[in-house]
């Protein structure tokens, strides 16, 4: 079943959090993104405590994972921007000029819809009053692993960049894959999707969950592509970087996709 009133609540909360994007449009997709996921998780927990949704350990773990994932991600991005002047410069160069207000308004609404869709796998389980299942627990395990991987990758990157600001991170997780943090995000949403596979009751729910998953995977690959483009502009003539990039998968470990841009291998 669909509970449009509750989806409307989640949408309104997401729009509220994403208002920060009117200051810098990139915030719609960064700080607003994480905090939207976090606040939707909190809303689900509160509504469950009010008796609106079934209460179970598995459900509350998923609410907690939404909060941890979103709060950690946006908190990390916010602190990095405040403390790191080099990152602020890179962010300014990457975003370029501010966009017109009507474009911001469209992005605001679109991102609000997207973030509700991304979390809809858990919402549909609540709406359908589905029992806990093996699928849900497998999804929880995948999502938890994704959060841990992303957090460790961010920490390792910060440590390595502090030691070598003139080079990309290449050690530890970065020996296995060049964008382990993006891979962690894909894993997190893979877990959310897997957890919902046995509780969806109509075509609309299936379409919403699958399209949201495709969108986030596309966004992660696009993010990796843009990151690689910036790295190529900065380190493209550095043999150490090119050797590393030519032999290390860009976003999925063991998958031999090394570049998402046209590259002349030297």
PLM region spans:
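Membrane-interface module
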Residues: 69, 73-76, 101-112, 190-192
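A basic- and aromatic-enriched beta-loop-alpha substructure that forms the phosphate/nucleotide-
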Residues: 58-98
